[in-house]
């Protein structure tokens, strides 16, 4: 198997080989011989005395070419003038020695050998074609059995296996009427005599006639392989090799080490084994050796060739002298160190260097400091050129000398060369495109690169010893691209969310915050100033302080009708610091943006506003000035930390005493048996959690205020100037949670498994921890450190998979013209609007007109890009939902269109053609991956578990509405008890817009009615957070069934209290098999002792107790509707094992089926229950036409529907995690997209990471890019095969044009790994994972790679079809088409 020779430099010397696609196939023996320059007959490599290659050996100069340039081996012909002569003495052609890198040899095998990839790469292709099992084929190949190749007139079957004894018996019986062979010859004979076309016909007929699914799948697979062979014109017997190609010797070198030893490539060993065994076999055949010996030798030859191709795939791996498995040809290309990932995708480049980075606070945003020494080395060729040009040096050698001596002129020339020549800085790991940015170098002394502080966030760099790499763009085009696209000052916005990434942090924030804070009664309060200059003078002469409140006249610039700036003078009440800051504001940015204490969030908003109002250039200048100012005032402010800044609240002792008393009370209740151990633990944890919060609140209240005397002599509170508080409040460093640990109490700690230790750490760091407290704390903290190490690798792998699945998605056209899209609403969770509608639709293109709900007039027409102005207008008009275009519904075939994608987040305008939106999406999702948690539950070292919620309150005034799934009954006390599983109370405002949505659990008590007007803060429902009740919907007298103590229920007596309760035992733990199936249930009787039935049916009421339930009713007890039958204790304070963080994101993108998946209704209809089987319940849904759909559900699962309930298709009927494949099948693409986007966003939102929905949608598009053919119609597809969506669309269009029947297909969801591997490009798939399998499959299919994606083009070394490369590829394409048309025309004229 060989990638067909792309580059043969000898044939195409001086001419660039142009190609548009790469085809892979199986090489025929003739092809292999045609590549070869001669047969390798001997296993020898080089002569040990002369070090010259042996003739006919593995390094033979006659076959592979001369060892030295233009010199034959015996030395008869030397020098260029004999070029092309073949020496008659040694037979070597006189030419360049580098031909030894490309000339191949071959080995003529004495017996055919099966190619291991087609045999052992699962599913076995040989097995598939021959319809034999792998085990059978192996028995034949490795000489354990005969296979009948031609049964002749005997009753034997073709492909039947015979043992040796059988074979000889049959020979006696039938003579030579039949043919049976052993080894690869037998298999080759079978392959050769297989009639491919006939077999395809038979299979197609079978496919139509068969009914079983498994059979259809099996036939379809086999059909696909045979059709591929038929189509590509490759012969089946080529999978068995007669000739083995030999790799050119310089690709498997033999290097002499000192001391007369040699370092050699493992391939030489493997080849030698093959040649040795092959030669031995030839000799044995000539001698007519006994069969058994020949057979053994053939088997050994087969094994040697197996090892050469893929060592270790079958049997034990061949090892070298040092017991290490030898590296075979397959190992050369696969894995991280293989050809693809190491050499083709991970090339190293010249003109680069690396050094440690330090701060460059005086730099401008587009500059970086480059050490002179580095610059001299990096720009050497440029300097040589200039030195020669100026006549300072006559030759390169002389120039080199001057540079080495570092004469003064060299430095002047270096300055010239470097002027306006951008360089690129990169910090590993490069997680997103901002990890490489271009800067203009400024020469500096010293040896460290100086980096602008504001770009640190993008590089994720700090100055604790980080290193960065420098690269020099050489060509003019490269320099231009670096300057226009990559210059740091052109990358102000983050491509992940469109917000500024050039945002001041730490010292700068602290300085700006300190500068813009106001003080009460500072020196000179209430002064009036005519302009800022006057403020400056007053400040410098110490007449006023930085925080003094003053009134000042400020000149602002406002745009007039013509769009030009005009000065407007306003009076402002402000502070000295803010007035000084107003000087650096760009034109057009109103003063009110800085007329407040600037915290980190405010500064971010300020820069964002500046970008939107004043444009890129002014923003960059403004950011730089902010930085200089911030650093200046941070230095002048002299803010530092002292132990006294950590003020411990006076109330702490009292609060601790109170909590201890409560805990003691709970312990007492537990001793008296009023609460279980689990409840006691939960309550204790809750008490300590609350105590910690109270202390933290007291501490923050104490820290954040300080008493001062105002101008009138009264004592007033003002915001504190405590250093620690200022650092946290400004967002420069630290958070309330950390201050709480410094001067409040450390609080509850978690064990590594996530459970909370019930004794909290009551001290803080200022008081110091006792040994025990310290020990408790270390437990969780170490887990955190171990986690971080794992997290990085996992996050990197997720990014790699994401990039791989989206790498070929590029914007290729402006508008695909579709009117499809998704409807966007605000995301409401609990009482909060988590993401407003305006944020979700900003930068999208509308798919249909947006209409004002009150007046009915069109606000925005379809096909409009929604800018900030438009979304604000939509927001004010009270529109609830907007239909926008999305990448998922884009109709463009290979790529996306600009309108479906919308705004390029990093540039703030509609995306350009050629933007690699796929990779950007992958990076935006992958880059914050390291910030996500690895744990399943998110608890830091300090347990940040909110006390369990036990009620919901309204956050705003409005009307309460119950959701459609709401079900409740009224109990004897008149309370409304919820008995539905997915119930929600929704609150609408006066216009009827949804403002809040609250989930209400099963068993909650509702305190409001449907349609009732409510006030903010009103409680809507309450419930017990620690147990889950089991509630009856019917009244009657209790009658138990299967309630046998010790069999189905156990009496649990608490050791401490001596009280006993009945608890249901898990069926799996029961002793006898009969009792495993018994379920304790409760029936209800009326006053006459007759079983009560479900109203409207004849089915008696029967409720089964789930495992672990604590039963709270007695036999014969009268109960009413809504009463509790049993309580199921919730797992103790481990928050329910929710997969969170990184694993959750990976799970969603891999589209994994969850373990205990819930079930969705397959059809719309009415629910009823059928006859139960052992351990399963039968649920039936009958639709309107009376068609019933049955499903069996395990009794352990919770069914969320009841008899007679009407369910809609796609509604949840069994509790559990949702399976995304079900959502796609039953609810469609939009519902699926909404589910994945929301779930992924939830994980990131928890960590405070903002990512645009767009990026997730781009990935979903790639997960949905293949479809399953349900009915092939007349399109030539096979029913049941998976194909690219674009291919089906194209085939269907063609079929409809020709009046044929189009194919029907269903959408399928592929996980990202699967989707990457199933891409059309085999080069991209092979370089991702499972290289062997991908290449084997591609070779059999005779696949052609059209080189559409980015990865394939990088691998073959062309410009990528994205960005500036897209235009290059397009123009080349047009040229080709022009050439083709011309040739066609000339042919016509010739004829």
Curated annotation (Swiss-Prot):
It holds the Pfam family RNA_pol_Rpb1_1. CDD domains: RNAP_beta'_C, RNAP_beta'_N. GO terms for molecular function: DNA binding; DNA-directed RNA polymerase activity; magnesium ion binding; zinc ion binding. Mg(2+) binds at residues 462, 464, 466. SUPFAM superfamilies: beta and beta-prime subunits of DNA dependent RNA-polymerase (SSF64484). GO terms for cellular component: DNA-directed RNA polymerase complex. Zn(2+) 2 binds at residues 816, 890, 897, 900. Coiled coil: none annotated. It catalyses: RNA(n) + a ribonucleoside 5'-triphosphate = RNA(n+1) + diphosphate. Its EC number is 2.7.7.6. GO terms for biological process: DNA-templated transcription. Binds 1 Mg(2+) ion per subunit. Binds 2 Zn(2+) ions per subunit. Keywords: DNA-directed RNA polymerase, Magnesium, Metal-binding, Nucleotidyltransferase, Transcription, Transferase, Zinc. Its cofactor is Mg(2+); Zn(2+). InterPro entries: DNA-dir_RpoC_beta_prime, DNA-dir_RpoC_beta_prime_bact, RNA_pol_asu, RNA_pol_N, RNA_pol_Rpb1_1, RNA_pol_Rpb1_3, RNA_pol_Rpb1_3_sf, RNA_pol_Rpb1_4. It is an enzyme of class 2 (transferase). The keyword Transcription applies. It comes from the Bacteria. Zn(2+) 1 binds at residues 72, 74, 87, 90. DNA-dependent RNA polymerase catalyzes the transcription of DNA into RNA using the four ribonucleoside triphosphates as substrates. The RNAP catalytic core consists of 2 alpha, 1 beta, 1 beta' and 1 omega subunit. When a sigma factor is associated with the core the holoenzyme is formed, which can initiate transcription. HAMAP family: RNApol_bact_RpoC. Belongs to the RNA polymerase beta' chain family. This is DNA-directed RNA polymerase subunit beta'. It comes from Neisseria gonorrhoeae (strain ATCC 700825 / FA 1090). The gene is rpoC.
């Amino acid at each position: 198997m060989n990638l067909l020779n792309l580059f043969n430099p000898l044939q195409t010397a001086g001419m660039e080989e142009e190609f548009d696609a790469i085809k892979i196939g199986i090489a025929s023996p003739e092809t292999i011989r045609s590549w070869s320059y001669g047969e390798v007959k001997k296993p020898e490599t080089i002569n040990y005395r002369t070090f010259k290659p042996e003739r006919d050996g593995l390094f033979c100069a006659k076959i592979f070419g001369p060892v030295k340039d233009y010199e034959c081996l015996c030395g008869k012909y030397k020098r260029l003038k004999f070029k092309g002569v073949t020496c008659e003495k040694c037979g070597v052609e006189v030419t360049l020695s580098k031909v030894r890198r490309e000339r191949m040899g071959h080995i003529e095998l004495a017996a055919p050998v099966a190619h291991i990839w087609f045999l052992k790469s699962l599913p076995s292709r040989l097995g598939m074609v021959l319809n034999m099992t792998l085990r059978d084929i192996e028995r034949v190949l490795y000489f354990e059995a005969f296979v009948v190749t031609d049964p002749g007139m005997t009753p034997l079957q073709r492909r039947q296996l015979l043992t040796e004894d059988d074979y000889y018996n049959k020979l006696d019986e039938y003579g030579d009427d039949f043919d049976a062979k052993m080894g690869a010859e037998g298999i080759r004979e079978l392959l050769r005599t297989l009639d491919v076309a006939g077999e395809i016909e038979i299979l197609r007929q079978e496919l139509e006639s068969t009914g079983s699914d498994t059979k259809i799948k099996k036939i379809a697979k086999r059909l696909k392989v045979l059709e591929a062979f038929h189509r590509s014109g490759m012969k089946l017997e080529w999978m068995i090799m007669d000739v083995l190609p030999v790799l050119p010797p310089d690709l498997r070198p033999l290097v002499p080490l000192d001391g007369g030893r040699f370092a050699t490539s493992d391939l030489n060993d493997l080849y030698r084994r093959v040649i040795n065994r092959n030669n031995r076999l030839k000799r044995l055949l000539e001698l007519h050796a006994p069969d058994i010996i020949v057979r053994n030798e053939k088997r050994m030859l087969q094994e040697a060739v197996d090892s050469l191709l893929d060592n270790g795939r079958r049997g034990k791996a061949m090892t070298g002298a040092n017991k290490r498995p030898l590296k075979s040809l397959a190992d050369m290309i696969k894995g991280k160190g293989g050809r693809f990932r190491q050499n083709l995708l991970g090339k190293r480049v010249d003109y680069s260097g690396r050094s440690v980075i330090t701060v460059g606070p005086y730099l401008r945003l587009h500059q970086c400091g480059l050490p002179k020494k580095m610059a001299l080395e990096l720009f050497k060729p440029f300097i040589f050129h200039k030195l020669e040009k100026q006549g300072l040096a006559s030759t390169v050698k002389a120039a080199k000398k001057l540079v080495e001596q570092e004469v003064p002129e060299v430095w002047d020339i270096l300055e010239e060369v470097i002027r306006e020549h951008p360089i690129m800085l990169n910090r590993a790991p490069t997680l997103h495109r901002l990890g490489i940015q271009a800067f203009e170098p400024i020469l500096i002394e010293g040896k460290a690169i100086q980096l602008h502080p504001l770009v640190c966030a993008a590089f994720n760099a700090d100055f604790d010893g980080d290193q960065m790499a420098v690269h020099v763009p050489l060509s003019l085009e490269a320099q231009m691209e670096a300057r226009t696209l990559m210059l740091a000052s052109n990358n102000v916005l983050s491509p992940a969310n469109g917000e500024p990434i050039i945002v001041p942090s730490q010292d700068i924030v602290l300085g700006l915050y300190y500068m813009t804070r106001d003080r009460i009664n500072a020196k000179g309060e209430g002064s009036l100033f005519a302009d800022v200059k006057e403020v400056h003078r007053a400040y410098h002469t110490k007449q006023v302080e930085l925080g003094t409140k003053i009134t000042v006249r400020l000149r602002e610039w406002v745009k007039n009708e013509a769009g030009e700036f005009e000065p407007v003078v306003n009076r402002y009440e402000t502070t000295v610091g803010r007035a000084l800051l107003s000087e650096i504001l760009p034109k057009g940015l109103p003063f009110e943006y800085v007329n407040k204490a600037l915290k980190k969030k405010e500064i971010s908003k300020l820069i964002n506003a500046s970008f939107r109002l004043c444009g890129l250039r002014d923003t960059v200048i403004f950011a730089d000035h902010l930085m200089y100012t911030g650093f200046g005032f941070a230095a002048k402010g002299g803010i530092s930390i002292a132990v006294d800044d950590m003020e411990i609240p006076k109330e702490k002792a009292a609060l601790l005493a109170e909590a201890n008393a409560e805990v003691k009370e709970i312990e007492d209740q537990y001793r008296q048996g009023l609460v279980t151990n689990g409840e006691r633990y939960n309550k204790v944890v809750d008490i300590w959690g609350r105590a910690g919060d109270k202390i933290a609140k007291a501490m923050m209240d104490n820290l954040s205020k300080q008493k001062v005397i105002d101008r009138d002599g009264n004592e007033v509170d003002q915001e504190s100037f405590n250093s620690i508080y200022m650092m946290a409040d400004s967002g420069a460093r630290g958070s309330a949670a950390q201050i709480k640990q410094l001067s409040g109490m450390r609080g509850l700690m978690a064990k590594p498994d996530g459970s909370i230790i019930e004794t909290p750490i009551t001290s803080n760091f200022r008081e110091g921890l006792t040994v025990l407290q310290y020990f408790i704390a270390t437990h969780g903290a170490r887990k955190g450190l171990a986690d971080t190490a794992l997290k990085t690798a996992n996050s990197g792998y997720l990014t790699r998979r994401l990039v791989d699945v989206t790498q070929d998605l590029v914007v290729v056209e402006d508008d695909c013209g579709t009117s499809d899209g998704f409807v966007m609403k605000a995301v409401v969770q609990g009482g909060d609007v988590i993401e407003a509608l305006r944020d979700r639709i900003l930068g999208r293109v509308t798919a249909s007109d947006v209409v004002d709900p009150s007046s009915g007039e069109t606000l925005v027409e379809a096909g409009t890009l929604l800018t900030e102005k438009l979304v604000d207008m939509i927001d004010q008009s009270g529109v609830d939902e907007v239909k926008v275009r999305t990448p998922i519904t884009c109709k463009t075939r290979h790529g996306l269109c600009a309108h479906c994608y919308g705004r390029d987040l990093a540039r703030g305008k509609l995306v350009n053609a050629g933007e690699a939106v796929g990779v950007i999406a992958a990076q935006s999702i992958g880059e914050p991956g390291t910030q996500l948690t690895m744990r399943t539950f998110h608890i830091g070292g300090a347990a940040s578990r909110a006390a369990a919620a036990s009620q919901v309150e309204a956050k705003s005034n409005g009307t309460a509405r119950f959701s459609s799934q709401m079900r409740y009954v009224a109990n004897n006390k008149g309370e409304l008890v919820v008995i539905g599983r997915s119930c929600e109370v929704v609150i609408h405002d006066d216009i009827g817009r949804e403002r809040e949505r609250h989930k209400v659990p099963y068993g909650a008590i509702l305190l409001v009615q449907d349609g009732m007007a409510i006030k903010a803060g009103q409680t809507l429902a309450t419930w017990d957070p620690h147990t889950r009740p089991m509630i009856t919907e019917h009244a009657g007298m209790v009658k138990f069934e299967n309630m046998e103590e010790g069999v189905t229920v156990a009496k649990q007596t608490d050791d401490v209290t001596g009280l006993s309760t009945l608890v249901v035992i898990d069926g799996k733990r029961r002793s006898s098999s009969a009792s495993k199936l018994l379920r304790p249930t409760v029936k209800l009787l009326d006053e006459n002792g007759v079983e009560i039935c479900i109203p409207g049916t004849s089915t008696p009421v029967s409720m089964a107790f789930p495992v672990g339930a604590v039963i709270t009713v007695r036999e014969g007890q009268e109960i009413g509707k809504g009463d509790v039958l049993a309580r199921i204790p919730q797992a103790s304070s481990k928050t329910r094992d929710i997969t969170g963080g990184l694993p959750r994101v990976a799970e969603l993108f891999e589209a994994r089926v969850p373990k205990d998946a819930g079930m969705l209704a397959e059809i719309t209809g009415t629910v009823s229950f059928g006859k139960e089987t052992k351990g399963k319940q039968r649920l039936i849904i009958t639709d309107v036409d009376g068609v019933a759909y049955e499903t069996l559900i395990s009794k352990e699962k919770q069914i969320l529907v009841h008899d007679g309930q009407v369910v809609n298709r796609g509604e949840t009927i069994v509790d559990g995690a949702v399976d995304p494949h079900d959502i796609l099948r039953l609810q469609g693409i939009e519902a699926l997209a909404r589910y994945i986007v929301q779930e992924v966003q939830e994980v990131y939102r928890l960590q405070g990471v903002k990512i645009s929905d767009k990026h997730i949608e781009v990935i979903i598009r790639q997960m949905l890019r293949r479809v399953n053919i349900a009915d092939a119609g007349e399109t030539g597809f096979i029913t049941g095969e998976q194909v690219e969506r674009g291919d089906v669309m194209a085939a269907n269009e063609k079929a409809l044009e020709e009046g044929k029947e189009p194919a029907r297909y269903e959408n399928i969801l592929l996980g990202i790994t699967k989707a990457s591997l199933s891409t059309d490009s085999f080069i991209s798939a092979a370089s991702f994972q499972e290289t062997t399998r991908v290449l084997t499959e591609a070779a059999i299919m005779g696949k052609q790679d059209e080189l559409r994606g980015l990865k394939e083009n990088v691998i073959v070394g062309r410009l990528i079809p994205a960005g500036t490369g897209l235009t290059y590829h397009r123009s080349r394409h047009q040229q080709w088409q022009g050439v083709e048309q011309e040739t066609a025309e000339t042919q016509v004229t010739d004829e």
